[in-house]
Amino acid sequence: MEDINFASLAPRHGSRPFMGTWNEIGTSQLNGGAFSWSSLWSGIKNFGSSIKSFGNKAWNSNTGQMLRDKLKDQNFQQKVVDGLASGINGVVDIANQALQNQINQRLENSRQPPVALKQRPTPEPEEVEVEEKLPPLETAPPLPSKGEKRPRPELEETLVVESREPPSYEQALKEGASYPMTRPIGSMARPVYGKEKTPVTLELPPPAPTVPPMPTPTLGTNVPRLAAPTVAVATPARRVRGANWQSTLNSIVGLGVKSLKRRRCY
């Protein structure tokens, strides 16, 4: 049978197993035991008494005495009293300002009319009709009817435009075709191509020669055949090769030098 460590099952005091007597289980000596208020109060009293004794020692020491003398020289107590008094006066002033603001607001609300009076519509001013005599209107002259003409004033100028009729066809042929002019005004116009009045003709190329029609062949007659026209064919001129080694090499034709491969063992 294997050995079993029963110490892991025992109650613990921190990380150490508690293997002593069992009558102290449930008291304040173990973790999770009963809480003692008397021990807490005694600890607080001891802490307060230690602070008091330390303060008395510091106050009665030479350093404390020098500090008290310095505070008396600077009138520290009077400054503290003045500060407290100024703070109290400031609080009182703030309260007075808040009270005065509330009083002013209530007075303004009492002076304003109620809401019912605001909703009432204000009476509109009455309209009074006043008759005024206007000057007579100027009557416009009557417009002439469509059939009647408008009378002309005495001092009215009439613009007359004279237009020349184009010449007749026969007259234009007699005069001949005119050359284009350089200016549109008659006195300043000059012909472009000369002063002679010659008719303009259209030069056309001469007509192509016509081929006479061939007679229709009949039985027993030989049909003459037309000879084909001779056509000149241009042949390229041969290059004259110079008598040098390059032309000689170019004229050589053949397979070149014959070569023979032989394997020999030594």
From Swiss-Prot:
Q: Where is this region: Interaction with hexon protein?
A: 48-74, 249-255
Any GO BP: microtubule-dependent intracellular transport of viral material towards nucleus
The record's region (Binds to importin alpha/beta, involved in hexon nuclear import) falls at 256-266
Q: How is it modified after translation?
A: Ubiquitinated by Nedd4 following partial capsid disassembly; which might play a role in intracellular virus movement during entry.
Q: Where is this region: Amphipathic alpha-helix essential for membrane lytic activity?
A: 34-54
List the residue ranges of the region (Disordered).
Answer: 105-175
Find motif (PPXY motif) and give its ranges. 166-169
Q: What induces it?
A: Expressed in the late phase of the viral replicative cycle.
Propeptide segment residues: 1-33
Q: What is this protein called?
A: Pre-protein VI
Q: What organism is listed for this UniProt entry?
A: Human adenovirus F serotype 41
Which lineage do the record's taxonomy fields give for this organism? Viruses, Varidnaviria, Bamfordvirae, Preplasmiviricota, Tectiliviricetes
